[in-house]
Amino acid sequence: MKCPFCHTPDTSVIDSRVSEEGDRIRRRRRCPHCDKRFTTYETVELRLPQVVKQDGNRAEFDREKLRTGFVRALHKRPVSAEDVEAAMNRVVQKLLSLGEREIASHKIGEMVMGELYKLDKVAYIRFASVYRSFQGAADFDDAIRELQGSDSRKEPDKP
């Protein structure tokens, strides 16, 4: 690693310790050229997968788009900002745990629907109406029947 003081390209590690949380490593380094010491931290870099759109285009995952989807579906519903944030974090964590480089946008939509189903059934129907492109009242009736017929402990069947 380059020395931040004299910019010599090679430094040596004189001490390494794992943090109490176990999620990073603290390293004390020494520059052989200027003899100064400094600390670095090593952490795991987790990357969210690229989103493959329905038209085949690819885009970086955008947490703000995820937030917008939740906020629109939950507009004027009795769900706290903390619950929305927790649901978003669960979606992001699922994406990270997949370990994939790419994910189809419809899979993210299904994850969002699953979280909305747990949070608020009206928001679930709102999101489903846009996500599944409801064409009329019959589509709403089907979705409501699906909700009414499903066990309260499980998510409704996904297409």
Curated annotation (Swiss-Prot):
GO MF, one example: DNA binding
Reported cofactor(s): Zn(2+)
Matching HAMAP family: NrdR
ZnF locations on chain (unnamed): 3-34
Sequence similarity: Belongs to the NrdR family.
Gene: nrdR
PROSITE patterns in the cross-refs: ATP_CONE
Cleaved signal peptide residues: none
Pfam family name, one: ATP-cone
Segments forming domain ATP-cone: 49-139
GO annotation, biological process: negative regulation of DNA-templated transcription
Name of the featured protein: Transcriptional repressor NrdR
Cofactor note: Binds 1 zinc ion.
Role, per record: Negatively regulates transcription of bacterial ribonucleotide reductase nrd genes and operons by binding to NrdR-boxes.
NADP is among the record's keywords: no
Keywords: ATP-binding, DNA-binding, Metal-binding, Nucleotide-binding, Repressor, Transcription, Transcription regulation, Zinc, Zinc-finger
InterPro entries on file: ATP-cone_dom, NrdR-like_N, RNR_NrdR-like
